[in-house]
Amino acid sequence: MLNIVVVFPKKEIVLKMKNVLIKNGFDVSAVCVTGAQAIQAVERLEAGVVVCGIRFADMIYNELKECIPDTFEMVVIASNAQWQEYGDDDVIYLPLPLKAYDLVDTVSDLLTDIHRRLKRE
């Protein structure tokens, strides 16, 4: 089963992102406010997408990326200024202000790609 994990440092942002995804037909497996919580959540899951901000209280997104398995893809949502400071090309970046359809389309495409990849293996 493919999963979605949402990780942002503020609970209200996590819940907004979760609600956008749920309203568009996705199941959200976990919501987290720290990188450590996200790592614990991902360890229980097989594959999917991590939707996150660029920085958490305990780490930044690329530290989280190093801790998640290759069966997960990452979508980072951040301002252009944050991306200039911390970003790299190893993940998918969506700029703020975020359009809901950009998030939905990106997550949908990634889940489709992961599903195909897992079927081949």
Where are these regions (language model features)?
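Conserved acidic carboxylate
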Residues: F8
